[in-house]
Amino acid sequence: AILLPALARAREAARRASCANNLKQLGIIYKMYANESKGEKWPRNHGVQPWRPATAASLGCLNAHNGSQFGPDMVALYPDYLTDSNVLVCPSWNNYDMPPAIGVGVIEDDGSGTCPWVGFISQPGDCYHYLGYAFDRCDEGEPTVPHPYNPAVQVPSQVATTLMLPENATAMAVFLNLSTDPADNAALDQDLVAAAGDGNGGSQTIYRLREGIERFLITDINNPAGSAMAQSQLAVSWDMISSNWENYSTFNHVPGGSNVLYMDGHVEFLRYPHERFPVTRSWAEFWGNMPAQ
């Protein structure tokens, strides 16, 4: 009995390391994609896919899930860059024992031989979040605002205010699964309009992730000697983190914390609560109070 806690910690340490390796592989995949994409852009958000459940079922498809997902665009990545759905599943995830086909929504044929999307991954954002944008002002100490869906909690202004601006309405509709039109995905491939001071480097623009974007991310706009943020400081994907277990899994890892992939490809484990985005109380509140997809 004395050994059980130690064994549990050892198992979790191994799962955490495997989880970090998955994120590192995703970092390589994103870099490979960017090297071949127009403007060296990283993949956009998953968005609205053509396999809406009703349509997919009528064409003989199984496991075609609804929801835009806070993950990368699977049509762009599969199968040329991402070939193994297990890379998207953290071993510490509370649904890890679920078959991968169900857990991340790997589309299968129902036996009719008519499904056109066999093998595609319909819900890539269940374990690791990926937004496709550069958020550089979400650390603790940066400006916060009341959550648009729960004014009782404070969340990062750069994210919350930006998503609620009318100029970003189409992107917001896709993020919140309010759109059923795949044509709206074009909004996710554009930069977002931000309120004054909320944009990257204090501008009015939230840029899509692309190689070289760090040059636009000034660490301190009030300091004439302020330098650009390095890729090693820009978080691009991370373990699930939420303040609300009823809507979403709170953490993949116990004790609470997240593996975080940075744009240069390295991964760090940050224990919650941390002062650095995304393992902050304000970000956990933002995600935990979003409408469940």
Name every feature range the model reports, one short phrase each.
Residues 26, 79, 185, 189, ...:
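Intrinsically disordered, low-complexity regions
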Residues 213-293:
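C-terminal accessory segments of extracellular proteins
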Residues 126, 133-240:
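Acidic, glycine-rich loop-and-strand cores that form catalytic or ligand-binding grooves
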Residues 1-162:
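Hydrophobic alpha-helical segments and their capping/adjacent flexible loops
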Residues 102-103, 144-174, 261-293:
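Contiguous hydrophobic segments
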Residues 21-22, 35, 45, 63-66, ...:
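Detector for Asparagine
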